[in-house]
Structures are given as structure tokens and as C-alpha cells.
Amino acid sequence: MKIVYMHHAEREQNSHAAWGTPERTFDEITDLGRRQAELLAERLKNVRIKAIITSPYTRCRSTAEIINQYHHLDIAEDERFNESQKNEAWESLLKRNMAAIEDIVRQYADDDIIICVTSGVNISAFICYTYNITPSNDVPWTQAADLSPVIFTIKKAKDLL
């Protein structure tokens, strides 16, 4: 299967909200972010996407809905794809992300394409997992650009589990 980890579109930044606080969950995407997501939706309209899974954060959900305009799928929300919570350890973030990925691998077939709309820190966690980088608060977070896709292929559960 192909799992496409997708960073949400450009968002309105709430400069008064601290990282990992509930206020950050409501950041909406900008007009530019909407246009970015629309262009991506157009590009993906002929791709046979089996499922779209998103963080429930507003910016992620909005991005997923725009991508879904040609597919008309039920969008699933999974809190394990939320960004790091206030004072959350890197190990905890990685553990919940990988648990979500493992569930996806169990649920879908080898030829399925799954879109996961998430935040940049989750993409960083997956990159660390993939390249066997020990999770640590000292590992620098990668800065994912808006709508940065990370595509990986998994042959059912044997590759991951």
C-alpha cells in the first residue's frame, strides 16, 4: 500500500497560542492554503484513493475536505495524527503515530492508497522511524512546507509489524 503523509495547507497562525495548546487546534487555512489544496486536489483527482484520514485539527480537516472533493470518501479523524501536545515527549509522539500507521496497515490492502493529513512534527517522527533515528527531544524537528507529501510503500503488516 502507499501511505501519503501530507502536511496541511498553509494556515492562519494564532500568534498568541502556545505550541501544543487547545487554541492551536482551531487554526484555519489561509486563502493561499485553500488554493494550494485545490491544486493538489486537481492533481490527485484521478488517483484511486481508498481512504483519507486526518487529524481533527481544523487546518488538517479543511485540507482533507478539499483534497476529497473529487473522491467523495468518508473522511476519518484520528487524534493520533495531532501535532505534539504541550510538553509531550518525542517518544510519545512517535509511539502514537506508529500505532496509527500500524492500524492503517492492518485495515487496508497492499494496492490501496491512503492519504493522512497531519502536521509537520508527525512527518518528522515518521522520518526518524524510517531512518532509525533515535527519538529524542534533541533531534531537530524538520520544517515541512505546506502540503509536503511523504510517500511510502508498505507490503501489508509484515514490513511494519
Model-derived regions: residue spans:
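Short beta-strand scaffold positions
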Residues: T54-S55, K95, V117-T118
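Active-site-proximal alpha-helix that buttresses catalytic centers in soluble enzyme cores
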Residues: K2-E77, S84, D146
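Domain-level recognition of soluble alpha/beta enzyme cores
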Residues: Y131-L161
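Short active-site segment of divalent metal-dependent hydrolases/proteases
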Residues: R11, N122-I123
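Glycine-rich phosphate-binding loop signature in dinucleotide/nucleotide-binding domains
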Residues: N46-R48, I104-I113
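Generic beta-sheet signal
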Residues: I3, D110-V121
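Short alpha-helix plus adjacent loop in nuclease-associated cores
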Residues: F81-S92
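Active-site signature of alpha/beta-hydrolase-fold catalytic machinery across serine-
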Residues: I66, A125-Y129
